[in-house]
Amino acid sequence: MELGCWTQLGLTFLQLLLISSLPREYTVINEACPGAEWNIMCRECCEYDQIECVCPGKREVVGYTIPCCRNEENECDSCLIHPGCTIFENCKSCRNGSWGGTLDDFYVKGFYCAECRAGWYGGDCMRCGQVLRAPKGQILLESYPLNAHCEWTIHAKPGFVIQLRFVMLSLEFDYMCQYDYVEVRDGDNRDGQIIKRVCGNERPAPIQSIGSSLHVLFHSDGSKNFDGFHAIYEEITACSSSPCFHDGTCVLDKAGSYKCACLAGYTGQRCENLLEERNCSDPGGPVNGYQKITGGPGLINGRHAKIGTVVSFFCNNSYVLSGNEKRTCQQNGEWSGKQPICIKACREPKISDLVRRRVLPMQVQSRETPLHQLYSAAFSKQKLQSAPTKKPALPFGDLPMGYQHLHTQLQYECISPFYRRLGSSRRTCLRTGKWSGRAPSCIPICGKIENITAPKTQGLRWPWQAAIYRRTSGVHDGSLHKGAWFLVCSGALVNERTVVVAAHCVTDLGKVTMIKTADLKVVLGKFYRDDDRDEKTIQSLQISAIILHPNYDPILLDADIAILKLLDKARISTRVQPICLAASRDLSTSFQESHITVAGWNVLADVRSPGFKNDTLRSGVVSVVDSLLCEEQHEDHGIPVSVTDNMFCASWEPTAPSDICTAETGGIAAVSFPGRASPEPRWHLMGLVSWSYDKTCSHRLSTAFTKVLPFKDWIERNMK
């Protein structure tokens, strides 16, 4: 395939040569063709096509004409290989060519650009670099394409050196500067000694040659491009940079090098040493940081520190100091400790006590791009493995506690199997000093009981079942005394601080007046009806607030629902877990066809009964009864009732075993089906026992429940 492309390209060039050698009297064979040149390229060409592009400089539409011929499918195929819009990539101003509906030979003659970007030249603006001999000048490269290579050689007069200063630098950053970079060497070719290699956008200090020539190389790889760079240069003598300290005099010799004549009391090649007393030279601030004198006598002449001077070091934003924060000038003229460095790092994100964090071993992360796929298809495995790839720089330097190196990965998981994670499971320290992904958190898994089916629910511990107790205020009756607690209802735990309960359980009968929170409490993990038989694992929690639904009707018991906010969080365990809230769309079958499990304690049980000690949490299966049939059923027994949209009626399911009398429990109703967070079956809260007229538990009359589905949004708003 590649050979065919090169053959076609070669033929195209041959055709172009033939065009230039045509005699003037050449007559067009096909008068419908755009011109003689097109006829030579495609003998039967009678049409042309236009390539539409955008000029990068001014963003106007440009283009050019190419000959084309109709194929068997009546499509116009190009008669020659053309480069598409890449010919305009480095243009600052483009020639409009044919993009206006007229015929031309724009592409054939190759007038691509009216003006190139600064630093680029040639018909396609892809050439760069030159030899510079002026005493001063500039090197400007405005933007750059992928895989660019440019070389400049600067020559100075004998006895002079060259000083190069970067005015602007915008290249891809890397600690090793191995992708996009400017490399400065002493001498006039690439074999000279490297003085400096720069990348990123931080301008280096002025660069000075050793001899009278300087070689500048720019290189870009095939992944990213930035704005380029701008540098100025000038010829100077070795003394131009004032290399002598302490007012020493710089003297040039015949070879162009220099010597320093020092004042009394100073010595050294650059007069840098003080003879009169010991002191410490300025340690300088770390790269990407700075220093401050925070103690002691300070500096001498701004360059040396007296004995006892304390210097503190600081880093710029998103950098962290590694090493000694302070250094002191000692009696021997040396600084204490080691010079610190500033490292790009990320502060560890805060997590809750429910989340466990683990630092993963440092490893190279790879990304597969379309270029990798191209290499995989075009080259052998051996050649592909030898192709250069980018690797992140290895971390260096120790960081203070609470910080992590660039590219460090943190893995998160919940500390307990009863919780599930929200947010990212893995986060990476980015170059910006921030972490990828979202902050993790752990919330309790709702509605999960292992290996439980609806027909086998008797004698089970339902971990979301909450026992609601009220404090007595009347005189004792033989079994209760003033101030004692007695069980009044069951509620459902929906998160660590929220219990959903029927509103009539926490209000005065027939009123909307709420019972004082001090006279109510919630017990979780309870199983036996007798409080004396409860295990030590139960949790007795105080209530901080009662939220009554605003539409609660204490007469009809419409909107019979309330929320209890717990003062302390419930401790999630095998015995205490929340139940899920369901939405209508979550039900796989219609609500009327659902088999619902009801659970609760017999709140009317006689404490003096022989079986009271062994009475436990009861459960059974009920079926939903049509609201109209429920009303007619009660009317047949002389009890007129109204079943609202916020209620549903249910009666005992004769095919399923049951040990519960729903009229005596004040319990909760739940259904098991797969949830949105997990395909595994989860139990969802569907209702709360509201009212019943079946005094004998004969199952002749249905029990009315508060339907939880219409109140889902209201519950979730108050769960936060």
Swiss-Prot record:
The keyword ATP-binding does not apply. It is found in: Secreted. Residues 128-236 form the CUB domain. PROSITE patterns: CUB, EGF_1, EGF_2, EGF_3, SUSHI, TRYPSIN_DOM. Disulfide bonds join 128-150, 177-199, 239-250, 244-260, 262-271, 280-329, 315-342, 414-442, 489-505, 630-649, 661-697. Keywords: Disulfide bond, EGF-like domain, Glycoprotein, Repeat, Secreted, Serine protease homolog, Signal, Sushi. Its main location: secreted. Residues 1-21 form the signal peptide. Residues 445-720 form the Peptidase S1 domain. Glycans are attached at residue 614. May play a role in regeneration of skeletal muscle. PANTHER family: INACTIVE SERINE PROTEASE PAMR1, PROTHROMBIN. This is Inactive serine protease PAMR1. It comes from Homo sapiens. The lineage of its organism: Eukaryota, Metazoa, Chordata, Craniata, Vertebrata.
